[in-house]
UniProtKB/Swiss-Prot annotation:
Function, as annotated: Cytokinin-activating enzyme working in the direct activation pathway. Phosphoribohydrolase that converts inactive cytokinin nucleotides to the biologically active free-base forms.
Source organism: Oryza sativa subsp. japonica
This protein's name: Probable cytokinin riboside 5'-monophosphate phosphoribohydrolase LOGL5
Family assignment from sequence similarity: Belongs to the LOG family.
Pfam families: Lysine_decarbox
Entry EC no(s): 3.2.2.n1
GO molecular function: cytokinin riboside 5'-monophosphate phosphoribohydrolase activity
InterPro entries from the UniProt entry: LOG, LOG_fam
Listed GO biological process terms: cytokinin biosynthetic process
Gene Ontology terms: cellular component: cytosol; nucleus
Residue ranges of the region described as Disordered: 1-28
Chain sites annotated for binding substrate: 103, 121-122, 138-144, 150
C-alpha cells in the first residue's frame, strides 16, 4: 500500500508538471516598436530615481519595446540601458562622434549609431522612436524634452511625450507650463501634448492610450526633414510648407 501511495503522488512532482508551472511570462502587447528615453547622465541624489530607471527598462522589455537613447553607461542612462539589454531587449545608442568622449559617457550597450553632431543625435533618436519618455535629468534632458514637445506642437510628429514624474520631480515644470497656459503663451490643446505619471507602468499605459490633441488653426504645418549630406543641414530636421494649416 505504501508503494501504491508513493506512485500515486509521483506525478505531482514529475519534471513535466514542474516545467508546466515554469511557463515564461507573456510579453504585454504594445503599439510601440521603439521608445526614446531622455534622462540624466548622473544618478541623482535619491535612490528612487535609480529604481525608476531600472523599472522603466524592465517595463520596456516586458512589453517587447526597444530602447533608443543617447548612448553611454553612466547615471540614469546607464541604468535604463543595462536593464533593457540585460533583460534581453534591443538597445540603440545614438552617439555623436568626437563630441562626447568615451571616458566621459562610458561604453554604449547594444547597437551603436554614430552621428556627426548633437543636432543629428537628437534628430536620429526622434526619427527612430514611436514615443518619448523623460526620466529625471538636467539641462540636456530638458532641452531634448522641450524640443520634441515643440515638434509635436508644430505638427512635425504625432508621437506621445511622457514625463516619468518620480517623487514629483517634474511638478514645478508642469506648474510652469500650466501658468504659461493661464497667461496665454501655451494653448490648452498644446498642454495636452504632455503625459505624466509617477510610475513606469502607469506612464506606458497612458502613452499607449494617447490621442494627439487638435492643433491650433494658425499652427504651421511642418514636415520632417533629415539631411545627411552636410553638417550645414544637420540641424534642420523640418521645413515649413508655404501654406498654413487651416
Amino acid at each position: 500500500m505504501m508503494m501504491e501511495n508513493s506512485r500515486e503522488q509521483q506525478p505531482e512532482s514529475s519534471p513535466a508538471n514542474n516545467n508546466s508551472k515554469k511557463k515564461k511570462k507573456k510579453k504585454t502587447a504594445s503599439r510601440f516598436r521603439r521608445v526614446c528615453v531622455f534622462c540624466g547622465s548622473s544618478p541623482g541624489k535619491k535612490a528612487s530615481y535609480q529604481v525608476a530607471a531600472v523599472q522603466l527598462g524592465q517595463q520596456l522589455v516586458e512589453r517587447g519595446i526597444d530602447l533608443v537613447y543617447g548612448g553611454g553607461s553612466v547615471g540614469l542612462m546607464g541604468l535604463v540601458s543595462r536593464a533593457v539589454h540585460g533583460g534581453g531587449g534591443h538597445v540603440v545608442g545614438v552617439v555623436p562622434n568626437g563630441v562626447l568622449p568615451r571616458e566621459l559617457i562610458g561604453e554604449t550597450l547594444g547597437e551603436v549609431r554614430a552621428v556627426g553632431s548633437m543636432h543629428q543625435r537628437k534628430a536620429e533618436m526622434a526619427r527612430e522612436s514611436d514615443a518619448f519618455i523623460a526620466l529625471p535629468g538636467g539641462y540636456g534632458t530638458l532641452e531634448e524634452l522641450l524640443e520634441v514637445i515643440t515638434w509635436a506642437q508644430l505638427r512635425i510628429h504625432h508621437k506621445p511625450v511622457g514625463l516619468l514624474n518620480v517623487d514629483g520631480y517634474y511638478d514645478s515644470l508642469l506648474a510652469f507650463i500650466d501658468k504659461a497656459v493661464h497667461e496665454g503663451f501655451v494653448s490648452p490643446p498644446a498642454r495636452r501634448i504632455i503625459v505624466a505619471a509617477p510610475t513606469a507602468s502607469d506612464l506606458l499605459c497612458k502613452l499607449e492610450e494617447y490621442v494627439p490633441p487638435p492643433h491650433d488653426a494658425t499652427a504651421l504645418k511642418l514636415t520632417w526633414e533629415m539631411s545627411t549630406v552636410s553638417e550645414q543641414h544637420a540641424g534642420s530636421i523640418y521645413s515649413p510648407k508655404p501654406d498654413m494649416a487651416r
